[in-house]
Amino acid sequence: MGSEINDKVYLSKGWGYVAAVSLLPYAILKSLWAWGSTVGLTTKQVVQSVIGFGETLQEGSSFLYTLYTIGIDFTALLAVLASLFAIALVTSWGEKLPRWLLIISGWAVGVFTVIVSFLTVFQFLGILPKGYTEGLAIWVYVVTYGGLFLWGITVFMATLSFQHRMKTKRKKNNLLLLYILNILTMAEVFYK
């Protein structure tokens, strides 16, 4: 009984839905900054840096600059694509995509999340140097890094669930094929 409950949680499609919404606060925050908001910025230097980010983009890619001028931060767009990837792991249209692509990508996300998590712990312990942390409210780190961590873990779990569902579906399809072959074989023997 306990194993069935664990399997339901472990193999739930809910992981993909949680992953899909985990990056939306990040996408909203980055979009707010692209629209000129200073929410979460605590120093004038960082405010000027965010405000001047569009000018920095103007010197580089015209595509990224155009997106930014209409209020679309490229990383926010990537967050939305990452959410769509998570949804693909739990919906019927995702099952039409190449399985290997979703499974390899999902496993890579899981491994990468574990590595980054260890590196973050090492930074907090002082084993690795910390990056520049001035100028942003602490909740900004929770929204950005917390969302990325949650996304990584839940995408990994959604991948395991997807892998299990596809394996079960393949077994059912193989049984159906064997059943049809048996019927055809019996029909062939009967008509001989």
Task: Place the predicted regions along the sequence by residue.
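N-terminal signal-anchor transmembrane alpha helix
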Residues: 17-36
